[in-house]
């Protein structure tokens, strides 16, 4: 067992150890995949724990995979890496559609495809691979997902039937709309002025 000093070396070796799982099902993981620890394109605003970019997205024409620095457990990192390698196998062509699902199920992923994770048999293999790789040389980031609190949206309500519609700010200058049932002007509800 090699003691890896950086997470990228660990991740690249993990790809090599995961390739036979794909090869056994006749799927080829590209030899030149690049794997790094980093946030998905949505940054910390989302709960994405991995992302694969297609070859056409990079100037060196290689799939680039990012594993979230919020992950620290080696088996969870490998689980996420398998999911992203499925994307690399089909060069991100099918997102989480039928072709992705076919590949994912064949290598042992389960559950809804957008968040497909290792089934029991695959998880057992991942535990062995994690043991072979040794500790994941990474300090897990404690990321807090802060929800943006938005102001309540202006609305209009019919005085007769209570029918309510949200209003877009650009239409507020025209005044409240008419109730589609009663044909009367609706009352303003919420913040109609900035």
Residue ranges and their predicted role:
Residues 1-73, 92-194:
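Metalloprotease/metallohydrolase-associated module, dominated by Zn2+-dependent proteases
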Residues 79-92:
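Active-site recognition of the HExxH zinc-binding catalytic motif
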């Amino acid at each position: 067992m090699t003691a890896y000093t950086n997470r990228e070396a660990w991740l690249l070796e993990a790809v090599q150890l995961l390739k036979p799982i794909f090869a056994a099902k006749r799927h080829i993981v590209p030899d030149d995949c690049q794997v790094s620890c980093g946030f998905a394109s949505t940054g910390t605003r989302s709960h994405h724990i991995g992302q694969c970019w297609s070859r056409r997205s990079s100037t060196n024409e290689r799939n680039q995979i990012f594993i979230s620095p919020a992950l620290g457990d080696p088996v969870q990192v490998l689980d996420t890496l398998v999911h992203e390698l499925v994307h690399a196998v089909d060069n991100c062509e099918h997102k989480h559609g039928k072709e992705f699902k076919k590949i994912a199920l064949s290598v042992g992923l389960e559950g809804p495809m957008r968040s497909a994770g290792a089934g029991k048999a695959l998880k057992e293999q991942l535990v062995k691979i994690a043991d072979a790789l040794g500790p994941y040389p990474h300090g897990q980031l404690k990321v807090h997902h802060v929800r943006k609190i938005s102001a309540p949206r202006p609305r209009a309500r019919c005085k007769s039937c209570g029918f309510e519609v949200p209003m877009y700010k650009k239409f507020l200058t025209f005044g409240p709309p008419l109730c589609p049932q009663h044909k009367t002007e609706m009352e303003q509800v919420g913040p109609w002025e900035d």
